[in-house]
């Protein structure tokens, strides 16, 4: 028998989490949101870093998934703002990019990204990353 703490975070009866998806591409936002919602996460979406920062100020967010390159405030700027914030500094941030440049991942690591994924990302890779990060946050909280 599986206890609630042994169940995958996104499964029915599990604690889940509220995830903020940030991407300027509406199709990408919709696809990522759908993957997460099917796994029973509460998903909010923003079109850029500025909008995401407003959402972070207004709601409890457990994890942020952000595109690296966006107009207005890009994912790297959002990551820096989150890491410098006393309130949000511990929120896991997953950086997404369409580029395969190794330097993109190195830069995200240097700025404090919790994980770095390359688009297109599979549902399995996304959900495994999210569950690992949320479980780590729950343990350290």
What are these regions (language model features)?
Residues 70:
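Receiver (REC) domain active-site loop signature in two-component systems and cognate sites
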Residues 59-65:
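Active-site beta3 strand of CheY-like receiver
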Residues 121-131:
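C-terminal output helix
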Residues 114:
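Short, glycine/charged-rich "phosphate-handling" switch motifs in NTP-dependent
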Residues 30-38:
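Charged docking surfaces used in two-component/phosphorelay signaling
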Residues 40-47, 55:
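Short hydrophobic/Thr-rich beta-strand motif most characteristic of the beta2 strand and flanking loop
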């Amino acid at each position: 028998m599986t206890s609630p703490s042994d169940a995958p975070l996104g499964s029915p009866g599990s604690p889940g989490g509220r995830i903020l998806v940030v991407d300027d591409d509406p199709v990408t936002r919709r696809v990522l949101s759908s993957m997460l919602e099917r796994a029973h996460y509460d998903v909010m979406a923003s079109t850029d870093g500025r909008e995401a920062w407003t959402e972070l100020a207004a709601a409890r967010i457990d994890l942020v998934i952000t595109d690296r390159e966006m107009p207005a405030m890009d994912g790297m700027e959002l990551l820096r703002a989150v890491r410098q914030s006393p309130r949000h500094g511990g929120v896991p941030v997953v950086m997404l990019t369409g580029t395969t440049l190794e330097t993109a991942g190195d830069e995200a690591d240097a700025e404090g990204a919790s994980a770095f994924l390359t688009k297109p990302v599979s549902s399995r890779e996304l959900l495994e990353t999210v569950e690992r990060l949320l479980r780590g946050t729950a343990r350290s909280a």
